[in-house]
Amino acid sequence: MITKADKNATRKKRHARVRAKLTGTAERPRLNVFRSNQHIYAQVIDDVNGVTLVSASTLDKDLALNGTSNTEAATKVGESVAKRAVEKGVKEVVFDRGGYLYHGRVKALAEAAREAGLQF
């Protein structure tokens, strides 16, 4: 039986493999996604300078959310992080799915960010 700890360890290994090949620059930063059971978080990161440019999550007070662990909440987080990034002058990003499958909440966040103006 696969336990939650085993799944998370596998995800972390997968993320480490992907991160070895992915780097965010000032011109094209990395859009990182972290998904917990209750919330979803997105950050636009410049890895060269080690700086988070913008971030958004379901914990933000300005996002009026009914539930925080569903695809609608992920969509709102994607729109929010994209709007904040475009305001900072970031138009292109590298998408880092954080070792998660491109499905469900991660996919909803990515598609909402694309529709709100980010290119990846």
From Swiss-Prot:
HAMAP family: Ribosomal_uL18_B. It comes from Bacillus cereus (strain G9842). This is Large ribosomal subunit protein uL18. The keyword Iron does not apply. One of its GO terms (cellular component) is cytosolic large ribosomal subunit. The keyword Cytoplasm does not apply. Signal peptide: none annotated. It comes from the Bacteria. This is one of the proteins that bind and probably mediate the attachment of the 5S RNA into the large ribosomal subunit, where it forms part of the central protuberance. It holds the Pfam family Ribosomal_L18p. The lineage of its organism: Bacteria, Bacillati, Bacillota, Bacilli, Bacillales. Part of the 50S ribosomal subunit; part of the 5S rRNA/L5/L18/L25 subcomplex. Contacts the 5S and 23S rRNAs. GO terms for molecular function: 5S rRNA binding; structural constituent of ribosome. Keywords: Ribonucleoprotein, Ribosomal protein, RNA-binding, rRNA-binding. Belongs to the universal ribosomal protein uL18 family. Disulfide bonds: none annotated. GO terms for biological process: translation.
